[in-house]
Amino acid sequence: MDKVQHVILVLSGKGGVGKSSVTTQLALSLHDSKVYSRPLKTGILDIDLTGPSIPRMFGKDAERNRIHQSSAGWVPVYTDETKEIGLMSLGFLLTSKNDSVVWRGPKKAAMIRQFISDVSWGELDFLIIDTPPGTGDEHLTIVESLLSETSTVRDVPIDGAVIVTTPQGIATLDVQKEIDFCKKASIKILGIVENMSGYICPHCADCTNIFSSGGGLTLSEKYKLPFLGSVPIDPKFGEMIENLTPDSNIVHLYSKTEMSKKFSFITNEFLNQLYGPRKLDTITTISGHTGRLWSVAAHPMLPLFATSSQDKSVRIYNSNTYNLVHVIDGFHTRSIRRVAWRPIERPVLAVASFDSVVSINEKIDDDWECTAALEGHENEVKCIAWSCNGNYLATCSRDKSVWIWEATEDDEFDCLAVLQEHTQDVKVVTWHPTEDLLVSGSYDNSICFWRDDGDDWALTCQLQGHTNTVWALAFSPNGNTLASADNDGNVFLWIKISSNEDVATIDSTNILRPALQEEWKQQTSLPHIHKGAVYTISWMNDATLCSAGGDGKIVVYQREKHDEALWHVAYEQDHAHGVYEINSLEYLRDDRLLSGGDDGECRVWSFK
């Protein structure tokens, strides 16, 4: 149990309500959940000792799927060769599936303790325990055994319970006793599922009530518990279960059913309750620009942020009061695509324009002055970024080049390098937060890494993982992870390989020879939520990232504590700027989020 991350009980209080069916569908739905960055590793522990149904629900039996021992304990029966869903049930230990279990309480308790302590699950994201009906000794033994086995590795032995009922009053009456049991045992109830809420006609797909309706919802309202959803009786789902064989791939078969689509909503509600409700609240909306807003940028040290626009102006605001501090305009002749604050303790702002010029603006005394104009690009400047100590400024352009400028002691700027490895428009540049490592992304779908090798700035790594334009790049605050986003709506996470052994064992996307300095690999792909290009990404902290783009949606992702490569969608904010696209996101230091869109507005959000 030391490698099991979440433990969930499925309870009913009454037999015959389809608890094992809900357990099965919850496990299958979690495995294929779209809110995670990979399929989840899930275990099902069937502790309904006198009526073990889980083997049959997965098309397994004791004749062909016997439990065997390893040095670590009992090895589960897996649904397929991926070993992503494991099963443990007394049904696998009986000589015949027709054998009855006629045991007294002490023997049942001993079997439950052995199931909890002796099964070698390996690394599991979720362990779902299918419990027997009622609130008797078996339930107490489950809770006590989990507490005993997990007390040294988990703060809470059970993450929560899902309670299953049917609509009838006789079922909800018994479920109320189960609710009281959870209260006395200090088990959090994640929600109520109403099973058998209707009957789906196999011919016309209409759903008809065959019992009373709304019992589960009424129960949830009475006890102020989350209502996860209703599950109708679908003959096609029953037919699928009946036709399963030990060789059937239930994961694939279930994903094709209508029930899987219905149950995915229940699973999403379940996850919302497990992680806690999260949302983005609008703090304020800031207007003033007369064209689309291209970028937002927060000063890393001072209470200032800047916005830039198609209207050729930059507006600077106090991030505490949201009052307008200054407007920079009149210098640039075309849209201002990007602004970036120099990371020093005075207000110096770089401004990049489609007029191919980058201006450096600084507050001197009580006024803002343009102290330098950097020229050299042949076309629109698309992005600018300062190095971690503010010594270097990188600029990139539609002319396919990346320029690196050095700020001298007298605040002049010298061009150190013109990098021309990209074969198309360069969309974005960003620097590592603690090293002089520059990364660029392009319309040619590639990501390039650059370092000063002592004589010049050299290309040290080139990644070809994207199959469309790379619009956004951002390092995590600790610098260990690089996030990238593209025109297909993908958000990838990349990590640096630290040893020669790692280099030898991965399929590298670096097209340069391995002897060069940098070797990065794709760690994971975040859940594909966006329906269109992702133009902007921003880190709140090392475990929280947000993205936005052409679909007008802001998505917040969070990393699981037990697996750095496993991320889930924490929240989706649809229509964050109405019907308009979102071009820029940036977190302020206190975790407020700035967003800028084609509506010309900057919105300030709080993530709760």
From Swiss-Prot:
<feature type="repeat" description="WD 5">
    <location>
        <begin position="465"/>
        <end position="504"/>
    </location>
</feature>
<keyword id="KW-0539">Nucleus</keyword>
<dbReference type="GO" id="GO:0046872">
    <property type="term" value="F:metal ion binding"/>
</dbReference>
<comment type="similarity">
    <text>In the C-terminal section; belongs to the WD repeat CIA1 family.</text>
</comment>
<dbReference type="GO" id="GO:1904564">
    <property type="term" value="C:cytosolic [4Fe-4S] assembly scaffold complex"/>
</dbReference>
<dbReference type="GO" id="GO:0005634">
    <property type="term" value="C:nucleus"/>
</dbReference>
<dbReference type="InterPro" id="IPR019591">
    <property type="entry name" value="Mrp/NBP35_ATP-bd"/>
</dbReference>
<dbReference type="GO" id="GO:0097361">
    <property type="term" value="C:cytosolic [4Fe-4S] assembly targeting complex"/>
</dbReference>
<keyword id="KW-0677">Repeat</keyword>
<comment type="similarity">
    <text>In the N-terminal section; belongs to the Mrp/NBP35 ATP-binding proteins family. NUBP2/CFD1 subfamily.</text>
</comment>
<dbReference type="GO" id="GO:0016887">
    <property type="term" value="F:ATP hydrolysis activity"/>
</dbReference>
<feature type="binding site">
    <location>
        <position position="204"/>
    </location>
    <ligand>
        <name>[4Fe-4S] cluster</name>
    </ligand>
</feature>
<feature type="repeat" description="WD 3">
    <location>
        <begin position="376"/>
        <end position="415"/>
    </location>
</feature>
<dbReference type="GO" id="GO:0016226">
    <property type="term" value="P:iron-sulfur cluster assembly"/>
</dbReference>
<dbReference type="GO" id="GO:0140663">
    <property type="term" value="F:ATP-dependent FeS chaperone activity"/>
</dbReference>
<feature type="repeat" description="WD 1">
    <location>
        <begin position="288"/>
        <end position="327"/>
    </location>
</feature>
<keyword id="KW-0408">Iron</keyword>
<keyword id="KW-0411">Iron-sulfur</keyword>
<keyword id="KW-0004">4Fe-4S</keyword>
<dbReference type="GO" id="GO:0005829">
    <property type="term" value="C:cytosol"/>
</dbReference>
<feature type="binding site">
    <location>
        <begin position="13"/>
        <end position="20"/>
    </location>
    <ligand>
        <name>ATP</name>
    </ligand>
</feature>
<dbReference type="InterPro" id="IPR028608">
    <property type="entry name" value="CIAO1/Cia1"/>
</dbReference>
<dbReference type="InterPro" id="IPR000808">
    <property type="entry name" value="Mrp-like_CS"/>
</dbReference>
<dbReference type="GO" id="GO:0051539">
    <property type="term" value="F:4 iron, 4 sulfur cluster binding"/>
</dbReference>
<feature type="repeat" description="WD 2">
    <location>
        <begin position="331"/>
        <end position="371"/>
    </location>
</feature>
<dbReference type="GO" id="GO:0051536">
    <property type="term" value="F:iron-sulfur cluster binding"/>
</dbReference>
<dbReference type="InterPro" id="IPR027417">
    <property type="entry name" value="P-loop_NTPase"/>
</dbReference>
<dbReference type="InterPro" id="IPR036322">
    <property type="entry name" value="WD40_repeat_dom_sf"/>
</dbReference>
<dbReference type="InterPro" id="IPR001680">
    <property type="entry name" value="WD40_rpt"/>
</dbReference>
<keyword id="KW-0479">Metal-binding</keyword>
<feature type="repeat" description="WD 4">
    <location>
        <begin position="421"/>
        <end position="460"/>
    </location>
</feature>
<feature type="repeat" description="WD 7">
    <location>
        <begin position="576"/>
        <end position="608"/>
    </location>
</feature>
<comment type="function">
    <text>Fusion protein of two essential components of the cytosolic iron-sulfur (Fe/S) protein assembly (CIA) machinery. Required for maturation of extramitochondrial Fe-S proteins. May form a heterotetramer with nubp35, functioning as a Fe-S scaffold complex, mediating the de novo assembly of an Fe-S cluster and its transfer to target apoproteins.</text>
</comment>
<keyword id="KW-0853">WD repeat</keyword>
<comment type="subunit">
    <text>Heterotetramer of 2 nbp35 and 2 SPAC806.02c chains.</text>
</comment>
<feature type="repeat" description="WD 6">
    <location>
        <begin position="529"/>
        <end position="567"/>
    </location>
</feature>
<dbReference type="Pfam" id="PF00400">
    <property type="entry name" value="WD40"/>
</dbReference>
<feature type="binding site">
    <location>
        <position position="201"/>
    </location>
    <ligand>
        <name>[4Fe-4S] cluster</name>
    </ligand>
</feature>
<dbReference type="Pfam" id="PF10609">
    <property type="entry name" value="ParA"/>
</dbReference>
<dbReference type="GO" id="GO:0005524">
    <property type="term" value="F:ATP binding"/>
</dbReference>
<keyword id="KW-0547">Nucleotide-binding</keyword>
<keyword id="KW-0963">Cytoplasm</keyword>
